[in-house]
Amino acid sequence: MQKETSIFLPSQVTVKVHPVVIFNILDHYIRRNVGQDRVIGTLLGFNNDGVLEIRNCFPVVHSETEQIAVEMEYQRKMLDLHLKSSPREPIIGWYATGNDINENSVHINNFYRDEMGNSTPIHLTVDTGLTNDTMGIHAYMAHNLSLNPESSLGSYFSQLPLEILTFEAENAGLESIAQTKYDQQSTSLLSELESLQGSLTKLDEMLESITSYIESVEKGEIQGDPRLGRFLAKTIQALPKANAQVMDKVINNSVKDLLMIVYLSSLTRSQLAVATKISHSLSN
C-alpha cells in the first residue's frame, strides 16, 4: 500500500471532472431513498501522466445505519457492462454527496481500493447542502499513517487540485443553464438559428475587443503581451485564405441551408400534428 501511495503524491496529481458526472451525481441524490443522508457511486475515467480525468459514473446501493454495507456485487456487474462499451474508462474512485469525510468514508474507500487491486482511489465529494450558498466540489486521496510497513495507525485524506473540464457541446448546454443563475425562471434550449446568432454576436464582440487592444498597443497606451501577440498571429495564420466575397458567399449559403432545414422541420411538425388529429378523429 505504501508503494502505491508514494506514486500518487498530492503535488503530482490533478483531477479533471466533466459536467455530466456532476449532473449524474445530483440526479442520484434527488432520487435517493427517503431518510438517506447521502449517496455514493463509482467514478470512471483514466490516468494520463498524473492527470486523472473523470468521464463517467454510476450509482451504487449502500447503507450507513448500524454498520456500513456496500453492494459491491452490483458495482461489479455495472462496471462489467460499462467496460463493454467503454473499455478505456476503468474504475478510478468513488463519489459521495455531502461535505464531510467520516469514518464510514474510510471503510468505503477501502472497499474501492480492494476493487482496484490495491491502487489508490480518488474520492469526489459534492456538497448538496450548499454550504455558504455554494455547491462545493472537491477531490481527495487517502493515505496510510504507519510507523512500519506491517502496521497502520489510520488514514487521512488530502485534497487534490480539481478542474471542471468541458467539451464544446457541453459548453453550449452549460451556457443555457447559466441563464437562470440569478432568477427562478426556466429556460429552453436555443434553436439552431438562435444559437448561430448568439455565436456570431460573441465573435463580433471578441473581434472588437481584440481590435481595441491592438490599437491601444500601437498608440503606446498599454504595454503589449508577447504571448498574446504570438497567439493572435498563430490564430490568423490558421484562418483559411479566401477573399471577402468568397467568405460571404460561403456564409450566405450556410445560412440559406439552415433556414431551409428550419422551414422543413416546421412543415414536418405541422403535418404530423394534422395526421395525429385525423387519426384521433377516425378512432373516435
Swiss-Prot record:
Gene3D superfamilies: Cytidine Deaminase, domain 2 (3.40.140.10)
PROSITE patterns found in the cross-reference section: MPN
Predominant subcellular localization, coarse grouping: cytoplasm
Cross-referenced Pfam families: JAB, MitMem_reg
The UniProt record lists the keyword Protein biosynthesis: yes
One Gene Ontology cellular component: eukaryotic 48S preinitiation complex
Localization terms from the record: Cytoplasm
UniProt keyword Plastid, yes or no: no
Family according to the record: Belongs to the eIF-3 subunit F family.
Function as written in the Swiss-Prot or TrEMBL entry: Component of the eukaryotic translation initiation factor 3 (eIF-3) complex, which is involved in protein synthesis of a specialized repertoire of mRNAs and, together with other initiation factors, stimulates binding of mRNA and methionyl-tRNAi to the 40S ribosome. The eIF-3 complex specifically targets and initiates translation of a subset of mRNAs involved in cell proliferation.
Protein name: Eukaryotic translation initiation factor 3 subunit F
Protein species of origin: Dictyostelium discoideum (Social amoeba)
